[in-house]
Amino acid sequence: MEDTVYKNLEDAAKLYGPSELADNPELRKEEVLSVLKKLDLESVKGSKCSSLSGGQKKKLTIAMEYITRPEILFMDEPDSGVDGSMVMEVMTTLREITDEGKILCVITHTPDRIRHLFDKVMVVGKSSEGCGRLCYFGSVDNALKVFAAQSLEEIVHKISGAENAALVDQYVQWFENERRGGHAG
């Protein structure tokens, strides 16, 4: 038997949330209802998860992480599987979460779609060693200058693929030098 939206969120709070949520059913219920409201999922709280739209499923995933009260939320492709009309709603919710002081770490290959979420960007590329290396961390505007790019997606294109490993190595070296000198970002 499949659980409802409410039950999934309640279980996340009980299993992964702070002890005060796990140990206090009344507080947990209050928190679940609050998060359902924040993520605009109140109208589907009694629905089975399989009946949700792609955007609602994405919001439930966010809600299940958010209710655990993390300092950092990790989102892998938060705009994938979400139709155009719902993308903005999901992204606005994520921006509101960051405005609360939470750190949002987003992994995306289409950063320009959600650029308004970013205060800073971290660019990681695959080096000649075959591993992910930090090429840049700082403001979006400065990233565009450093990579001589018109868009964030152009940066992704520049550092993607094995054929670009030597270029990634150059950016890694640049970033390490800048970091030592205190000029990056």
Predicted regions and their residues:
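ABC ATPase C-loop
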Residues: 65-66
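Conserved catalytic motifs of ABC-family nucleotide-binding domains
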Residues: 69
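Topological signature of polytopic alpha-helical transporters
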Residues: 11, 16, 20-31, 45, ...
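H-loop/switch region of ABC-family ATPase nucleotide-binding domains
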Residues: 107-109
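Conserved ABC ATPase signature
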Residues: 48-52
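Catalytic Walker B motif of ABC-type/P-loop ATPase nucleotide-binding domains
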Residues: 73-76
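ABC transporter NBD signature
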Residues: 4, 53
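Helical segment within the ABC ATPase nucleotide-binding domain
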Residues: 87-100
